[in-house]
Design a protein with these regions (language model features):
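Exposed, polar/acidic Ser/Thr-rich sequence context and nearby capping/turn residues
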Residues: 1-169
Length: 169
């Protein structure tokens, strides 16, 4: 008597968990013509294996165009952008700034079971004033792409940044 057993294997892959970082993040307001201001930070940790983070999109509450310029991505060995000497700029990926997003793609960021720390850093346009409409960055797990598995952690909501002119102007 032969019997057949059907086995369904699940290859869900690892879970990548995002968490917000607040140490070293710039306070509001952002001042015209200032540089290298960390506007959002997050960590990414894999439950197993080494999936790659290949893309993510930071949403903005209003357009960041003509407010945030020279946007960069940094990684750090600790969870603070303020710590001197341990922040390294990531290069070699594609970046686009739209009316509602900061889009990072073609990334090859290997993740692991140890948290990896990321900071979105920008210069502040010289033309912003106290009348410039505020902008608030955010990151949802749905806007993060990994090579395998899934992403969890909810929404990371940054500071609602007002703007101001440089002191003495």
């Amino acid at each position: 008597n032969a019997s057949t057993v059907n086995v369904t294997a699940s290859a869900a892959g690892p879970t990548v968990t995002l968490a917000q970082l607040t140490a070293g993040i710039a306070p509001s307001p952002l001042v015209a013509s200032t540089t290298d201001k960390a506007i959002l930070g997050f960590s990414a940790t894999s439950s197993a294996g080494t999936p790659s983070m290949t893309a993510f999109n930071i949403g903005t509450s209003t357009t960041s165009v003509s407010k945030l310029t020279n946007v960069k991505l940094y990684t750090s060995t600790d969870n603070s952008y303020a710590t001197a000497g341990d922040n390294v700029q990531i290069t070699g990926f594609a970046f686009a700034q739209t009316a509602t997003q900061l889009q990072f793609s073609a990334l090859t960021e290997a993740l692991s079971t140890s948290a990896k720390y990321y900071f979105i850093v920008a210069d502040i346009d010289a033309t912003v004033t106290g009348a410039t409409v505020a902008v608030q960055p955010s990151l949802t797990n749905a806007n993060v792409t990994v090579s395998s598995g899934s992403v969890t952690g909810g929404t990371i909501t940054g500071t609602n940044y007002a703007f101001d002119v440089a002191a003495g102007t």
